[in-house]
Amino acid sequence: ANAQNCTLVSGMCHSLSAIFRYSLNMTDELSTMQNEMGHVRNYLYVMDVRNGATITYDYQIDSETLQDRLPRICLQPVVENAISHGLRNTRRKDKKLLIRSEHIGDNLVVTIADNGIGMDAQAMNELLEKNDRKRVESGVSIGILNVNARLKKIFGEQYGIHIESQAGEGTTVTITVPAIAEKNENSESENNGG
């Protein structure tokens, strides 16, 4: 038991320090899919230690997308919402979270889907479409609305987040951005992700 606690504490320290390092590194507003996934995996490890490993994760990350550019910390808030609002409140025993990345045409499409309680997707999509930047910039809006506003600001109004959901079945959040690979293919991964 003691050895297990040491491993757990060591893993938790590693993940937390990686999360802080990644979050505080503001040298570039863009990162890569690989680094974003490293950040998400560290976050999910911390959540598993905190809440117990009650969720099954399915990562379907196309290796062709790993060097594609994304705004820093754009996947983790969506994953956090899926856990906090979708999966935490469901009574199902088979909680699942899917994270998929793929190229569709000239775009990088990232899908984050849960089998949680679902939500009012129409109302949320209306808020996303409205893209109230003043609300986001004032700090009133955080999470998915903030991520959507950043995606639209960086890549254009045609990009961003779309949500589909069914009550009792789960929610699927789709992030669409242009597929732009990082110029330096040999870039060092910040988070050991991928």
Residue ranges of each PLM-predicted region?
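Two-component histidine phosphotransfer core
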Residues: A1-E164, G170-T174
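C-terminal end segment of the histidine kinase catalytic
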Residues: I163-G194
